[in-house]
């Protein structure tokens, strides 16, 4: 058993990691921490009372290194890089769920802040599993993709060779409220969200440059990504619709089937996808259709799992020599 820990256990992605790790056949959960201070897991997540007996400590690099061979950092952006640097230098493998290691330096500093660990940023592997599987097997530091980029890229990347990359790419995305995190805000207040839907940060969201950067990384194509996210009155789930211009005649579903023929956690659907069918799972469901030169691609994921925690666990599996799917959730929350 490989000893692992979670730093940032108080949030929703931390909770999902704990839930998967306590039943994982290859990992032993030996360390839980937050940046706020010592507490108990039931104080953070009452649903885990009687299930997890570990105390939750105040995060400390030396304590993590003593207890763990691999650690998940479920921390806010800008907070992870200080921990990751010290842990890697002590020989601990790191899977980071924040944005701190997922972008090129110029892109990160343009949209977040000055980076304090440029050395390890250059060494990180982007943990979009289907595209960086082999690199992750050798990685010491995996950088979890954003939830919206995960759904968007898994949907559109197979089509980049067939679309006009000089034309704008339009991405319409909708996410459940858990995507905004656990911290209270007016935007996520029940009265604001219930019976409502609204866009936020239209054409200015930080996931747009991530999507554009990774399209260029995989296919060498520079695209103008117009990204508009929306908040919907659902707890979890994410639906992304992408609109592009085809430059040749294709069968969209056949393109998807061939591209993902060996990827067991991608499901190609014959009908438009929905968020409930992937809730509680690591699956990404994808549907596509065309009308002349117009291409429509739609992807559905669980934003907390495939968009964050289960994708991080899949990366950890590969980093530790395990089967990619070990311990990943596959049974949806239905009904």
Swiss-Prot record:
Key word Oxidoreductase present: yes
Main location: cytoplasm
Coiled-coil residues: none
EC number: 1.2.1.38
GO terms for biological process, alphabetical: L-arginine biosynthetic process
PROSITE patterns from the UniProt entry: ARGC
Biochemical pathway: Amino-acid biosynthesis; L-arginine biosynthesis; N(2)-acetyl-L-ornithine from L-glutamate: step 3/4
CDD domains per record: AGPR_1_C, AGPR_1_N
Cellular location(s): Cytoplasm
Catalysed reactions, semicolon-separated: N-acetyl-L-glutamate 5-semialdehyde + phosphate + NADP(+) = N-acetyl-L-glutamyl 5-phosphate + NADPH + H(+)
Leading EC class: oxidoreductase
InterPro entries tied to this protein: AGPR_AS (IPR023013), AGPR_type-1 (IPR000706), NAD(P)-bd_dom_sf (IPR036291), NAGSA_dehydrogenase (IPR050085), Semialdehyde_DH_NAD-bd (IPR000534)
Gene3D superfamilies, A to Z: Dihydrodipicolinate Reductase, domain 2, NAD(P)-binding Rossmann-like Domain
Location of the active site: 147
GO terms for MF: N-acetyl-gamma-glutamyl-phosphate reductase activity; NAD binding; NADP+ binding
Alphabetical UniProt keywords: Amino-acid biosynthesis, Arginine biosynthesis, Cytoplasm, NADP, Oxidoreductase
CC terms in the record's Gene Ontology section: cytoplasm
Function description: Catalyzes the NADPH-dependent reduction of N-acetyl-5-glutamyl phosphate to yield N-acetyl-L-glutamate 5-semialdehyde.
Protein family according to the UniProt entry: Belongs to the NAGSA dehydrogenase family. Type 1 subfamily.
Protein name: N-acetyl-gamma-glutamyl-phosphate reductase
């Amino acid at each position: 058993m490989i000893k692992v820990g979670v730093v940032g256990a108080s949030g929703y992605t931390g909770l999902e990691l704990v839930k998967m790790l306590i039943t994982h056949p290859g990992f032993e959960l030996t360390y839980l921490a937050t940046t706020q201070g010592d507490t108990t897991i039931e104080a953070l997540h009452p649903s885990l009372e009687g299930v997890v007996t570990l105390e939750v400590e105040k995060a400390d690099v030396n304590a993590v290194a003593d207890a763990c061979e691999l650690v998940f950092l479920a921390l806010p952006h800008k907070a992870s890089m200080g921990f990751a640097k010290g842990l890697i230098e002590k020989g601990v493998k790191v899977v980071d769920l924040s944005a701190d290691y997922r972008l090129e330096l110029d892109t990160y500093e343009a949209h977040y802040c000055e980076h304090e660990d440029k050395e390890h940023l250059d060494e990180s592997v982007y943990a979009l599993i289907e595209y960086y599987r082999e690199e992750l097997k050798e990685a010491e530091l995996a950088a979890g993709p954003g939830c919206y980029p995960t759904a968007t890229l898994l949907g559109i990347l197979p089509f980049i060779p067939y679309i006009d990359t000089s034309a704008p790419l339009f991405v319409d995305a909708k996410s459940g409220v858990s995507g905004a995190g656990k911290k209270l805000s007016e935007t996520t207040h029940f009265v604001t969200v219930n019976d409502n839907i609204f866009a936020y940060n239209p054409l200015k969201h930080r996931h747009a440059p991530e999507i554009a950067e990774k399209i260029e990384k995989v296919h060498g194509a520079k695209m103008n990504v117009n990204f508009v996210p929306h908040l919907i009155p659902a707890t979890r789930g994410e639906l992304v619709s992408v609109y592009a211009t085809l430059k040749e005649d294709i069968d969209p579903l056949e393109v998807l089937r061939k591209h993902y023929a060996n990827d067991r956690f991608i499901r190609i659907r014959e009908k438009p996808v929905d968020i409930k069918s992937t809730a509680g799972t690591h699956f990404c469901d994808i549907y596509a259709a065309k009308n002349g030169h117009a291409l429509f691609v739609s992807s559905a994921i669980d934003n907390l799992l495939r968009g964050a925690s289960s994708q991080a666990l899949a990366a950890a599996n590969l980093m530790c020599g395990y089967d990619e799917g070990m311990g990943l959730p596959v049974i949806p929350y239905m009904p």
